[in-house]
């Protein structure tokens, strides 16, 4: 049996600024299956595209978001300009953009009542975190969805 530490649990105080509840990344990835991937690229060698393909292969519905290639197709999915323009349900906003863009992204995501704002590895933004918390959006930063799936769902 594989020994796991508690690193897969994040205190909700880290996500919402509240105490006493735990948010389990495994539960998030198991229960939320609709993902807006912000920073999607047509370049198949880019990390965002590799992760998008992985998520699709794992059964997630992934909506690529990139305002420079609106209407084009990445891995069989039409590209949107903003999260709020997506015409299907979105649970998780997975961000592959610089930290300073996170505020604009979370403000847009609020419009469609997303459940999770997930900033990829090396992406952090304290103001985006505050905005997410104020709107009861689970905030995760500096973590890769692909890596977390490999840890907890395989």
Per-range role (PLM):
Residues 4, 8:
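Cationic, low-complexity basic patches in intrinsically disordered or flexible, solvent-exposed regions
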Residues 45-46, 53-73:
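NAD(P)-binding Rossmann-fold cofactor-contacting core
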Residues 83-123:
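Mid-chain, well-packed structural core segment of small domains
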Residues 121-148:
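Rossmann-fold NAD(P)-binding glycine/threonine-rich loop
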Residues 148-154:
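A charged, well-structured terminal subsegment
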């Amino acid at each position: 049996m594989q020994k796991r530490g508690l690193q897969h649990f994040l205190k909700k105080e880290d996500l919402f600024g509240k105490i006493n509840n735990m948010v389990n990344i495994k539960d998030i990835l198991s229960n939320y299956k609709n993902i807006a991937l912000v920073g999607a690229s047509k370049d198949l060698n880019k990390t965002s595209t590799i992760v998008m393909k992985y998520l699709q292969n794992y059964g997630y519905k992934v909506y690529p978001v990139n305002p420079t290639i609106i209407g084009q197709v990445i891995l069989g999915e039409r590209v949107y300009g903003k999260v709020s323009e997506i015409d299907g349900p979105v649970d998780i906003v997975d961000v592959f953009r610089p930290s300073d863009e996170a505020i604009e992204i979370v403000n847009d995501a609020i419009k469609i009542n997303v459940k999770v704002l997930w900033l990829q590895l090396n992406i952090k933004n304290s103001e985006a975190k505050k905005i997410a918390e104020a709107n009861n959006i689970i905030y995760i930063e500096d973590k890769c969805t692909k890596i977390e799936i490999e840890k907890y769902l395989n």
